[in-house]
Regions:
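Helix-start/capping segments and mature chain N-termini
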Residues: 1-79, 108-219
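Extended, Lys/Arg-enriched charged tracts that mediate electrostatic binding to polyanionic substrates
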Residues: 88-99, 103
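Short, charge-rich binding segments
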Residues: 85-91, 111-113
């Protein structure tokens, strides 16, 4: 098979079989980025080519067809252009969130890859990620594992986020903003938080980043 030409639509509804691979076996990957208005009025986004590369790796891991990086970037750019009126103004702290995603769309009964897929991009205006401004948050070392050794922690798959829901709800119930996850094999090494990579700065100003095959590479 091959990808069709695609196109722009204002319809935000997706109609698929109730047996679709995405519904029955969580066969979906996604990316996330933002479009900003600069001080001089230009609309920009940061390195969508890297998001395209990451989605290629994610798709391959879940036995999904690779959506070419150049087409990924073009789809993102065209979608942002079509929604330029919804990009918040410079200085507002708000942005246009851009969500490219891919999923198995045809009926699948039996654990196997789907044979048909959809790649889509939608956008929505969002406020500042840190509602009260950039300030320290409370983090706990979680008793839960985010990813298994040799598992899917290094890709941006929907199933990883479903697995983290209980942990973040539990953290909030206990008065914490976020979880810090340790490596699940030895539980002695810091990996990442639920929503971001983790960076350490030593006393002499050196930046240290965790290295693990179960951490989602940042962009």
């Amino acid at each position: 098979g091959k990808w069709d030409e695609g196109g722009l639509t204002t319809d935000d509804m997706v109609t698929i079989s109730e047996c679709a691979g995405v519904l029955q076996y969580a066969q979906t990957v996604f990316e996330g980025m933002k479009a900003y208005t600069t001080e001089d009025g230009h609309i920009v986004t940061f390195r969508p080519d890297l998001n395209g590369e990451r989605m290629e790796h994610s798709a391959a891991r879940l036995e999904m067809p690779v959506f070419p990086k150049d087409r990924f970037v073009d789809a993102v750019v065209q979608t942002i252009k079509a929604n330029a009126a919804y990009v918040p103004p410079y200085g507002s702290g708000a942005t246009l969130y851009v969500r490219p995603y891919m999923f198995g769309s045809d009926a699948v009964i039996g654990v196997k890859p789907a044979s048909e897929y959809q790649f889509r991009v939608f956008t929505t205006p969002v406020g500042p990620y840190f509602k009260g401004g950039a300030k320290p948050i409370t983090i706990r070392v979680s008793d839960f594992d985010r990813a298994a050794p040799n598992g899917t922690g290094h890709i941006k798959a929907g199933l990883n986020y479903a697995m983290s829901l209980h942990a973040i709800v539990d953290a909030h119930k206990n008065g914490f903003d976020e979880n810090m996850y340790l490596d699940s094999k030895t539980r002695t090494k810091v990996e990442e938080t639920g929503g971001a990579n983790f960076l350490f700065v030593t006393k002499d100003g050196k930046v240290v980043t965790p290295k693990s095959d179960s951490i989602l590479p940042s962009i």
